């Protein structure tokens, strides 16, 4: 069952401006060490940071909290599965809120898609609850 859906559209130029104006103060406030490492290795840092920013906003919307109720930027980390597919790793308040959303006998699955077409970056997040099945 679908528990939450969120989307966000982010202007890459706005993120590039924040990178220029605030530098590490901005990136350390919003992004995890892993995200900063991945983005900083890219020639075009702005779009990479903007996609992740959009993912965090979309996730907060899917959680139904926005950036409040104990959910902070760095509680949501964009990571990649071995296949390369992006997903989200939640910690802190985001993880706690997600746990409260999931009905008994179910587990959460987060689905994330990212794209950019300058000057915009976009993210969609779906939070799904699936029944826990016993393994034999």
Curated annotation (Swiss-Prot):
Gene3D superfamilies per UniProt? 4'-phosphopantetheinyl transferase domain
Which cellular compartments is it found in?
Cytoplasm
Q: Which reaction does it catalyse?
A: apo-[ACP] + CoA = holo-[ACP] + adenosine 3',5'-bisphosphate + H(+)
Return any one Pfam family short name: ACPS
What EC designation does it have? 2.7.8.7
- Which residues, by range, are in coiled-coil regions? none
Which Gene Ontology terms of cellular component type are present?
Answer: cytoplasm
The UniProt keywords, alphabetically, are:
Cytoplasm, Fatty acid biosynthesis, Fatty acid metabolism, Lipid biosynthesis, Lipid metabolism, Magnesium, Metal-binding, Transferase
The prosthetic group or cofactor this protein requires is: Mg(2+)
| Keyword Nucleus attributed | no
Entry's InterPro entries?
Answer: 4-PPantetheinyl_Trfase_dom, 4-PPantetheinyl_Trfase_dom_sf, ACPS, Ppantetheine-prot_Trfase_dom
GO MF annotation list: holo-[acyl-carrier-protein] synthase activity; magnesium ion binding
Q: What is its main location?
A: cytoplasm
**A Gene Ontology biological process annotation?**
fatty acid biosynthetic process
Which positions in this protein are listed as binding Mg(2+)? 8, 57
**What is the stated purpose of this protein?**
Transfers the 4'-phosphopantetheine moiety from coenzyme A to a Ser of acyl-carrier-protein.
Q: Which family does it belong to?
A: Belongs to the P-Pant transferase superfamily. AcpS family.
Q: What is this protein called?
A: Holo-[acyl-carrier-protein] synthase
Q: Which gene encodes it?
A: acpS
């Amino acid at each position: 069952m679908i528990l939450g859906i969120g989307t966000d559209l982010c202007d890459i130029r706005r993120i590039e401006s924040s990178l220029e104006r605030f530098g590490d103060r901005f990136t350390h406030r919003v992004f995890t060490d892993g995200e900063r490492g991945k983005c900083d290795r890219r020639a075009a840092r702005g779009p990479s940071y903007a996609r992740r920013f959009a993912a965090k906003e979309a996730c907060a919307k899917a959680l139904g909290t926005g950036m409040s109720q104990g959910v902070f930027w760095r509680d949501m980390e964009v990571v990649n599965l071995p296949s390369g597919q992006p997903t989200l790793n939640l910690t802190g308040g985001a993880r706690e809120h997600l746990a409260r959303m999931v009905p008994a006998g179910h587990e959460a699955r987060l689905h994330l898609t990212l794209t950019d077409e300058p000057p915009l970056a976009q993210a969609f997040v779906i939070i799904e609850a699936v029944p826990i099945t016993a393994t034999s």
